[in-house]
Amino acid sequence: SITKSDLVEVGIPVISYGQVHSKRNTGVKVEEHLLRYVPGYYLESYPNALVNKGDFIFADTSEDYLGVGNCVYIDVADTLFAGYHTIIARSNHNEYGKYFAYLFRSSTWRYQIRKRVNGVKVFSITQKILGSANILIPPKNEQAEIVEYLDDICGRIDSIIANIYKRIDLLHEYRIRLVSDVVTGQIDVRDIVIPEYEYLEEEPDEESDDIESVEEETEEQEE
């Protein structure tokens, strides 16, 4: 199978475990930042790892409970591999594929997967577990309406999130530049007076801590 050591700078796109668990993976489409690459000759070496439009790439392990069931919906017809620690899922029907992408993000569907996984620090997801979950299949016109509605609402939310990430990146850049300018003497801070302020202690938020922990883990996995 394709492993992390097989990755190269330029080649055939591949999505692996780390990208599936990326905090920026919406689960409903292939995005540029999710792609890594393997050599072109892998087309002959690993044909079974190729995915088709309409397929899903699931992570077969998760280091946290919230990540159980994470996947990427393949909404493009490009040549693309499923990489290490992944499971390829294909529909036996002609239903609206993106409807399933949204369904797989729902807590109702994921509950079925989570209650069947095994593990303590690492949870394992198998084809059998995925296949044992029940799914809701409304009429095709209803699937299309559901997708259209969620695309609109989630698209707005994703746009806001993307803008926030951009601002965070700019703040990181500003902090780095500020530190550099101060320590190299480009900014003279000898006569700067820091105004008095009151330090407010925040009550610990367990849910927030869990989310931050998950984000730190997924950042490591994305590499």
Where are these regions (language model features)?
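Periplasmic-binding protein-like
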Residues: 109-112
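Short, solvent-exposed loop/turn positions at domain surfaces
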Residues: 1-2, 44-45, 119, 156, ...
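Low-complexity, Lys/Gly-biased intrinsically disordered segments
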Residues: 1-28, 39-46, 61, 214-219
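Amphipathic alpha-helical coiled-coil/heptad-repeat segments
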Residues: 137-223
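A short beta-sheet element
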Residues: 16-17, 42, 46-105, 124-126
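Hydrophobic pocket-lining residues within nucleotide cofactor-binding pockets
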Residues: 20, 130, 183
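A short glycine-rich beta-alpha junction/loop motif
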Residues: 79-86, 117-145
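Non-catalytic DNA-recognition/assembly elements of restriction-modification systems
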Residues: 1-5, 9-10, 132, 136-140, ...
